[in-house]
């Protein structure tokens, strides 16, 4: 029997309006179901939060949190990670664009292991 694992995607944003739509689309179109998308915004001054709110209207698995003070990248991710409830957590930057089978392939690869780490590289 194939068990569908609960996948949490954790993303931090800060002034990411240029790429946030493409990244959210690439997450939402994954071939493996995404349980929740946790987005922690570090007080963006552009339209990042407005764009995310537009997506939240259509997708109830997107959860937006906005910091009350600017934390910076690392502390912002630490806060966001604490909010994830899935069996597996996929970390995403706001300007990533995922291959449609990214999560499906990762889950197939790590099933059966008690500890797994996956590394991605930038290209282009």
Feature roles, as predicted:
Residues 1-124:
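Nucleotide-sugar donor-binding/catalytic module of glycosyltransferases
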């Amino acid at each position: 029997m194939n068990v569908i694992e609960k996948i949490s995607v954790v993303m931090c944003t800060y002034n990411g309006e240029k790429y946030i739509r493409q990244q959210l689309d690439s997450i939402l179109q994954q071939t493996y179901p995404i349980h929740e998308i946790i987005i922690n915004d570090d007080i963006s001054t552009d339209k990042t939060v407005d764009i995310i709110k537009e997506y939240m209207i259509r997708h109830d698995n997107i959860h937006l949190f906005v910091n009350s003070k600017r934390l910076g990248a690392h502390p912002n991710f630490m806060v966001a990670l604490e909010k994830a409830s899935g069996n597996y957590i996929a970390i995403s930057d706001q300007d990533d664009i995922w291959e449609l089978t990214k999560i499906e392939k990762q889950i197939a690869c790590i099933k059966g292991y008690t500890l797994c780490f996956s590394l991605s590289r930038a290209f282009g």
